[in-house]
C-alpha cells in the first residue's frame, strides 16, 4: 500500500488532493490522505473581504472528497520526521507516509508586538477577529502595515466598508511598485479617492498597544494595526530536516521534490521553486498548477516513470480596489509588467472571472485529470529549468 499524505488544504494542497484522487480512484494499492486544521476551505484571495465584515461562501472539504477514495483528517500538523516518514497531528496522532506533499503555506513575518497588538489575515478566523474589531471601533485610525498587494486590497476594502475610519497604508515600498506608470498611477489615485493615506518609505519596527514605532524613532497612533508586511514559512520543515531557504520554504528540485528528501514534494507558498527567472513568489496563480504537477508526478512514479520538470510563467497581477474598482497589470512570464493593463469595471469583471472560487474547478479535477495545458509554461523564460 502506497500512503500519500498531503499537508494543507489551501489552493495548492486541494489541487494536489483532487488530482491525485482522480488519477488513483479505484486502485486498492494507493491511499490518499489530506490533512488540514479546518474542514472548510479558506479562500485566501477573499480574506480582505471577510476582514471587513463581508460574507463569502464557505466550502466543505470532506463533502468534496466524498466518493473519491481520499480520506480527510482534521487537525494541526505539529511535527514532521522526514527520515522516519511520519507526521504528528495535534501532538497525539501519528500518520506514516511513503510520499508526502507539503502544502502548509506561510504565515506573517512579524516584528515585536505584532502577536500581541496587531491583526493578520493568516486565516478565516483571523479575518473574522479583524471584522469584529473594525465594527466595534466606529471611528479612529487603522494602520495597514505593508504596501504589497494584500495591503493595498485591505486598505481599499476597509476604507470603502468603514468610511468613518482613517486608513493609513504604510510600508517600505510604493503601492503598485511592480506595475507600469499608468496602472500604478490609477491604483494610487483610487486609494486617494477612498481616503487612504499612503506613507511609502516607512518601516515599522515595533507594534505598541495603541501605536506603531517606525525606524528612526517616530511613533504613529493606531487604534487598529493590520499586519500584511511579508510572509515566512512555519519552522516545521526545517525542524523536519528538510533543506529550506532563508524564509523557511522547502528548497525543491525542478520536479518539485525536496532536494534532500525526494519522497517529499513541496508546493504553494511553502516551497522555494526555482524557474529560469528566479524563485517563484507565493500566489494562487502558481499554487494550483504546482499542486496539479505534484499529483501528476506522484502518479508517474507509481507507474514506474520519472516525474517531469515543472515550468510556470506568470501572466497577470489583478488588484481589487474596493468592490467597484480594480486594476489588472498583465505581465511577462517572469512577472515583469507588460504595456497592457485594465482599469475600472473591465478590470473588476476580469478579476472576478479569474479569481472566482476554485471550488467548481476542484470538483471537475476530482473527476477529470488535468495536465500542463492547465497553465502557462513560461516559454523561453523557463526552458533552462532542469
Say what each PLM segment does.
Residues 1-70, 153-181:
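Beta1-alpha1 glycine-rich phosphate/pyrophosphate-binding loop at the start
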Residues 1-3, 69-141, 226:
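FAD-binding core/adjacent interface of flavoenzyme oxidoreductases
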Residues 72-80, 95, 163-254, 307:
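A Rossmann-like FAD-binding core segment of flavoenzymes
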Residues 323-386:
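C-terminal auxiliary extensions adjacent to catalytic cores
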Residues 116-139, 219-224, 228-289:
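FAD-site-proximal beta/loop scaffold in flavoenzymes
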Residues 12, 105-108, 231-232, 324:
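Short glycine-rich anion-binding loops that position phosphate/pyrophosphate groups of nucleotides
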Residues 17, 285-312:
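Internal hydrophobic alpha-helix adjacent to the cofactor/substrate pocket in enzyme cavities
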Residues 1-4, 11-13, 39-55, 100, ...:
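Conserved N-terminal glycine/acidic-rich loop preference
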Amino acid at each position: 500500500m502506497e500512503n500519500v499524505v498531503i499537508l494543507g488544504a489551501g489552493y495548492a494542497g486541494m489541487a494536489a488532493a483532487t488530482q491525485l484522487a482522480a488519477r488513483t480512484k479505484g486502485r486498492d494499492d494507493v491511499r490518499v490522505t489530506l490533512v488540514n486544521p479546518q474542514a472548510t476551505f479558506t479562500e485566501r484571495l477573499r480574506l480582505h473581504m471577510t476582514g471587513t465584515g463581508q460574507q463569502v461562501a464557505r466550502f466543505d472539504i470532506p463533502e468534496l472528497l466524498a466518493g473519491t477514495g481520499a480520506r480527510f483528517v482534521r487537525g494541526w500538523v505539529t511535527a514532521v520526521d522526514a527520515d522516519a516518514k511520519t507526521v504528528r497531528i495535534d501532538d497525539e496522532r501519528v500518520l506514516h507516509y511513503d510520499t508526502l506533499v507539503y502544502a502548509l503555506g506561510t504565515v506573517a513575518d512579524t516584528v515585536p508586538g505584532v502577536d500581541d497588538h496587531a491583526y493578520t489575515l493568516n486565516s478565516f478566523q483571523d479575518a473574522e477577529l479583524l471584522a469584529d474589531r473594525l465594527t466595534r471601533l466606529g471611528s479612529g485610525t487603522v494602520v495597514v502595515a505593508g504596501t504589497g498587494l494584500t495591503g493595498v486590497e485591505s486598505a481599499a476594502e476597509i476604507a470603502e466598508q468603514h468610511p468613518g475610519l482613517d486608513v493609513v497604508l504604510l510600508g517600505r515600498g510604493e503601492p503598485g511598485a511592480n506595475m507600469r506608470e499608468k496602472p500604478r498611477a490609477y491604483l494610487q489615485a483610487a486609494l486617494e479617492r477612498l481616503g487612504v493615506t499612503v506613507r511609502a518609505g516607512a518601516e515599522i519596527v515595533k507594534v505598541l498597544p495603541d501605536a506603531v514605532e517606525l525606524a528612526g524613532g517616530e511613533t504613529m497612533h493606531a487604534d487598529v494595526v493590520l499586519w500584511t508586511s511579508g510572509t515566512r514559512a512555519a519552522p516545521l520543515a526545517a525542524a523536519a530536516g528538510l533543506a529550506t531557504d532563508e524564509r523557511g520554504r522547502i528548497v525543491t528540485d525542478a520536479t518539485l521534490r525536496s532536494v534532500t528528501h525526494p519522497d517529499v514534494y513541496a508546493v504553494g507558498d511553502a516551497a522555494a521553486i526555482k524557474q529560469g527567472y528566479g524563485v517563484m513568489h507565493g500566489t494562487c496563480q502558481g499554487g494550483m498548477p504546482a499542486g496539479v504537477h505534484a499529483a501528476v508526478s506522484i502518479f508517474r512514479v507509481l507507474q514506474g516513470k520519472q516525474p517531469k520538470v515543472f515550468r510556470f510563467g506568470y501572466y497577470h497581477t489583478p488588484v481589487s480596489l474596493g468592490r467597484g474598482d480594480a486594476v489588472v497589470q498583465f505581465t511577462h512570464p517572469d512577472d515583469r509588467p507588460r504595456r497592457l493593463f485594465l482599469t475600472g469595471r473591465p478590470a473588476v469583471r476580469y478579476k472576478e472571472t479569474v479569481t472566482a472560487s476554485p471550488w467548481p474547478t476542484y470538483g471537475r479535477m476530482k473527476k477529470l485529470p488535468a495536465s500542463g495545458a492547465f497553465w502557462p509554461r513560461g516559454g523561453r523564460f523557463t526552458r533552462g529549468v532542469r
